[in-house]
């Protein structure tokens, strides 16, 4: 580290270095192969993982690529450097391909969910699944901020989302078993924890509201005392006119927390975090209900955390 250079500066520089390497590799490959941006990311990641140019390009292009890869060959990147750089690259891909990405989960929420998991799961290891994983960024954020050994699973019904999740997982050296399928057809059992960011869903007449159907299905995948932490729209319960969803959920589960999130985090509807445990409490514990301030308001945010800490201490979850 140079004189006057902070650890934060080094981390930021490493993140930029990794991003620039991927980006320049994609540019070189585009000039040679004219593939779409996600395909370019896949080729670049495969080259980096192989520590060699394994895609079909001529020697001149291979030499240019190797010069880029040499820039990162001996750098000790943190998992967060790699994750953040890849998330920025993937977001650029969404923009290049003109794909809406309004449901991208802010990193701060992944970190906050990791905190909630640490309060709910005391064991040193756990099985963890995101059945609506998208690019996998929220899942990887959670894993990176959990001081636990994770057996991780992910699912999405979009081929490229599963590919991107797998690519990032491989770069991070974090094993994640990824499924390409409808989340309602998953048959995992005895999971310790399920996390998700529910996509914005319009309620269709005479059809069951997808988030209700999904959450009831996910609850069947949890082990006894397992937990589910999901981000949902704040009007989530408004569609449960006859309380049918709530009655079905509460047969085997308890809602133990509801966290209202800052509006500034989302470009569309405001959202909340729903915390569910697959356990029925005889004393019918009240759930914790917290309205989070902006994450940049450290004093008020810490006050909200103290409320949650006090609830867990009182209720011995």
Residue ranges and their predicted role:
Residues 268-317:
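Flexible, glycine-/basic-rich loop-and-beta segments that form/coincide
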Residues 123-134:
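Conserved class I S-adenosyl-L-methionine
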Residues 158-188:
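S-adenosyl-L-methionine
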């Amino acid at each position: 580290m140079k004189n006057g250079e902070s650890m934060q500066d080094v981390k930021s520089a490493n993140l930029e270095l990794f991003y620039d390497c991927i980006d320049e590799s994609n540019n070189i490959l585009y000039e040679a192969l004219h593939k779409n941006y996600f395909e370019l990311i896949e080729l670049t990641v495969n080259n980096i993982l192989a520590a060699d140019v394994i895609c079909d390009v001529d020697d001149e292009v291979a030499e240019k690529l190797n010069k880029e890869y040499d820039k990162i060959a001996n750098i000790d990147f943190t998992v967060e450097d790699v994750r953040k750089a890849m998330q920025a690259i993937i977001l650029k891909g969404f923009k290049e391909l003109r794909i809406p990405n309004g449901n991208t989960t802010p990193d701060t929420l992944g970190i906050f969910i990791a905190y909630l998991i640490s309060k709910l799961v005391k064991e040193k290891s756990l099985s963890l699944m995101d059945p609506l994983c998208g690019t996998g960024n929220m899942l990887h954020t959670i894993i990176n901020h959990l001081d636990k050994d994770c057996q991780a699973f992910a699912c999405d019904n979009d081929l490229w989302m599963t590919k991107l999740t797998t690519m990032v997982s491989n770069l991070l050296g974090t094993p994640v078993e990824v499924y390409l399928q409808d989340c309602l057809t998953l048959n995992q059992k005895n999971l310790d924890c399920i996390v998700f960011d529910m996509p914005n869903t319009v309620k269709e007449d005479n059809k069951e509201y997808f988030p209700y159907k999904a959450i009831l299905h996910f609850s069947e995948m949890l082990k006894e005392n397992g937990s589910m932490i999901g981000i949902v729209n704040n009007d989530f319960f408004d569609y449960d006119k006859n309380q049918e969803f709530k009655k079905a959920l509460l047969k085997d589960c308890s809602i133990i927390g509801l966290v209202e999130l800052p509006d500034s985090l989302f470009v569309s509807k405001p959202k909340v975090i729903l915390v569910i445990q697959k356990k029925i409490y005889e004393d019918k514990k009240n759930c914790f209900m917290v309205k989070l301030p902006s994450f940049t308001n450290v004093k008020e945010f810490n006050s909200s955390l103290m409320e949650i800490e006090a609830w867990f201490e009182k209720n011995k979850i």
